[in-house]
């Protein structure tokens, strides 16, 4: 059946009515927790194990819709902050659940990449709510460092990643690696280099090998 009603639908979203979902028998949260537990038990003593979740901003976009959420920024910012409080609390509770199993957390903020939003929006609505999660994880658990991940050229957002407390970033092939290196120097931040996905789609090993070589050269010393 289709969705006939939704508390965040329309011009006056009922954010206060949203409840934070909990683990229930057979629901997705339980399935995720069980899967993470199995992986940690199997290989957690050999490698870092990360569990993935949507970051607070991306969760807010999924709930409200991108166009409506952006419109809310200009109509009533307090409405957006109220929703971000909810999604950040959801992320904190889910991180608790996964970190207790021995996994680190990846916060995927795919909806926060440029040019979907600009750096000012990122600073006000992405940084503080992701920082709430990363600080919580760092304070309570001895697990792999929390990661904030998104695609695209992250060069202009590097300072904000540092402010948000990430311990790992994904750096696309087209980023300014010298600038990234300058911002991560002396900090415990892992930089994960990413080749152009189109090179992988084409399936030509020679061009892919060349792309990997260029990426390795650009990231040398990080």
State the predicted function of each range:
Residues 23-222:
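Active-site loop segments of alpha/beta catalytic cores
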């Amino acid at each position: 059946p289709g969705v006939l009603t939704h508390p965040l639908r329309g011009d006056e979203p009922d954010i206060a009515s949203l409840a934070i979902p909990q683990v229930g028998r057979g629901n997705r949260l339980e399935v995720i927790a069980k899967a993470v537990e199995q992986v940690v038990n199997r290989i957690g003593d050999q490698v870092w194990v990360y569990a993935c979740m949507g970051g607070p901003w991306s969760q807010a976009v999924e709930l409200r819709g991108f166009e409506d959420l952006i419109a809310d920024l200009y109509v009533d910012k307090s409405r957006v902050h109220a929703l971000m409080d909810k999604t950040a609390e959801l992320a904190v509770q889910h991180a608790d659940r996964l970190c207790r199993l021995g996994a680190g957390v990846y916060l995927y903020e795919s909806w926060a990449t440029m040019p979907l939003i600009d750096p000012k929006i990122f600073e006000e609505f992405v940084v503080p709510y992701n920082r709430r999660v990363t600080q919580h994880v760092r304070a309570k658990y001895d697990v792999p460092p929390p990661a904030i991940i998104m695609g695209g050229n992250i060069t202009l957002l590097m300072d904000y990643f540092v402010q948000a407390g990430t311990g790992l970033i994904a750096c696309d092939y087209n980023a300014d690696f010298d600038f990234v290196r300058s911002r991560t120097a002396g900090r415990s931040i892992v930089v994960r280099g990413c080749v152009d996905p189109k090179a992988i789609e084409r399936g030509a090993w020679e061009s892919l090998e060349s792309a990997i070589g260029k990426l390795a050269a650009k990231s040398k010393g990080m």
